[in-house]
Amino acid sequence: MWVLGIAATFCGLFLLPGFALQIQCYQCEEFQLNNDCSSPEFIVNCTVNVQDMCQKEVMEQSAGIMYRKSCASSAACLIASAGYQSFCSPGKLNSVCISCCNTPLCNGPRPKKRGSSASALRPGLRTTILFLKLALFSAHC
């Protein structure tokens, strides 16, 4: 019975109609030469419930590396990244790589690696997945 309570709480918190989802991304609409647009002045709030992903485009040219970042809808971002997949060859001249992500500021600089943080997050994820499976199972019974 407690599982049903957890499922109801989960649904109440995350799946209510009208629940607004907004993400923050780095944005520089014009290509920036050797500037990856990852400083605070490039942070924007994306359009609620429309632009649910961050997009990053990296183009390697003879003059240097060009960056363009923006908010995007998941459909537009995934279509763009799939369309340019064959042109993505990091380190090669005229390479164009487009990537999409859906966590806050994920199109910014890569976080510095820490040895133990990745393994510390895994148990929480496993627990969350277990609770979701239990909730779904109890809902079908």
UniProtKB/Swiss-Prot annotation:
Entry annotated with the keyword Transcription: no
Glycosylation positions in this chain: N45
Membrane topology: Lipid-anchor; GPI-anchor
Molecular function via GO: acetylcholine receptor binding; acetylcholine receptor inhibitor activity
Lipidation (GPI-anchor amidated serine): S117
Secretion signal, residue range per the UniProt entry: 1-20
GO-annotated cellular components: extracellular region; plasma membrane; side of membrane; synapse
Keywords: Cell membrane, Disulfide bond, Glycoprotein, GPI-anchor, Lipoprotein, Membrane, Signal
Biological-process GO terms, alphabetical: acetylcholine receptor signaling pathway; behavioral fear response; negative regulation of protein localization to plasma membrane; protein localization to plasma membrane; response to nicotine; synaptic transmission, cholinergic
Quaternary structure and interacting proteins, as annotated: Interacts with CHRNA4 and nAChRs containing alpha-4:beta-2 (CHRNA4:CHRNB2) and alpha-7 (CHRNA7) subunits.
Name of the protein described by the UniProt record: Ly6/PLAUR domain-containing protein 1
Organism: Homo sapiens (Human)
Gene it is expressed from: LYPD1
